[in-house]
Design a protein with these regions (language model features):
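Short, well-structured N-terminal submotif of metal-dependent ribonuclease cores
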Residues: 1-43, 55, 60-67, 147-148
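Alpha-helix capping/helix-boundary segments
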Residues: 12-13, 44, 87, 107-108, ...
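Phosphate- and divalent-cation-binding pockets in alpha/beta enzyme and binding domains
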Residues: 25, 47, 90, 128-129
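Active-site neighborhoods of divalent-metal-dependent phosphate/nucleic-acid chemistry enzymes
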Residues: 78-122
């Protein structure tokens, strides 16, 4: 298992920034990024920007706060991987295994599997869909103690 890389999905980044019940757990994970390099497939950039734009659109954030959130996301220093055909095939296989119509989550799974590293999510639906698979490299953010401010 690769210990210097960790895959995080967009839900972790967004829930670390926007107020929600998992924020302190996500912030605890973000604190570990001094020890490990966070990484994600290229769609992470689109998903985080879209979530922040949606928060501004629905008045959860002001436009200025949205711009600050984009800066916070950028400051995470994510290593972005552009999927190749092997990643596409692996994502397709994960999508079929999960019995889903879209492959977004599957690209995170495929990347973690390919790079042989841990994958952290704050997406309960995704985590629950794979809980019975007992994937040692799949982690739910509440496994970490919340960050106390």
């Amino acid at each position: 298992m690769t210990d210097d890389l960790v895959i995080i999905d967009a839900s972790v980044a967004i829930k670390a920034i926007l107020p929600n019940p998992l924020q302190k757990h996500c912030l605890a994970l973000v604190q570990t990024f001094v020890e490990v390099q966070p990484a994600a497939p290229a769609l992470w950039v689109y998903e985080t920007t879209s979530a922040i734009s949606k928060a501004v659109h629905f008045d959860q954030l002001t436009e200025n706060e949205g711009r600050q959130a984009l800066e916070q996301v950028d400051a995470l220093g994510m290593q972005i991987f552009v999927p190749d055909i092997d990643q596409n095939r692996s994502a397709f296989d994960w999508t079929r295994r999960l019995k889903r119509a879209s492959a977004y989550d599957s690209f995170y799974l495929a990347l973690a599997q390919t790079l042989d590293c841990d994958f952290w999510t704050a997406d309960k639906r995704l985590f629950n869909a794979l809980k019975d698979a007992r994937l040692e490299w799949l982690h739910w953010v509440e496994e970490l103690a919340p960050l106390n401010n």
